[in-house]
């Protein structure tokens, strides 16, 4: 299931704002930048660099896995702008570990 349009960070201005103002939490595969957006609903962006995941098919699969986990855990109403960035190479067999990694890392984001 895809993220609803209102829950996506789409403009460069919004993404740059999160990188400037957001707090960073690191996991073993990914890091998350996020801050309180005062909107009442959360918006997300997923960045998977080709440096770490070379095939576009795999990059898209990772983005789908991450977005499905966000929708499944119903984190859409908490009021955060959040960017999830992959920063280490991931082999195909380890994509499922991303779900757990995302859950654990999201819980570490401090409320501000």
Each language-model region and where it sits:
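Positively charged, solvent-exposed patches that mediate nucleic-acid binding
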Residues: 1-112
């Amino acid at each position: 299931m895809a993220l609803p349009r209102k829950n996506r960070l789409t403009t460069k201005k919004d993404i740059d704002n999160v990188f400037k103002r957001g707090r960073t939490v690191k996991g073993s595969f990914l890091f998350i930048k996020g801050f309180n957006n005062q909107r009442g609903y959360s918006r997300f962006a997923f960045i998977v660099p080709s440096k770490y995941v070379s095939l576009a098919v795999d990059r898209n699969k990772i983005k789908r896995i991450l977005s499905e986990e966000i929708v499944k855990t119903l984190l859409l109403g908490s009021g955060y702008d959040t960017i999830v960035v992959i920063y280490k190479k991931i082999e195909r067999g380890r994509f499922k570990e991303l779900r757990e990694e995302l859950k654990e890392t999201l819980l570490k984001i401090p409320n501000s």
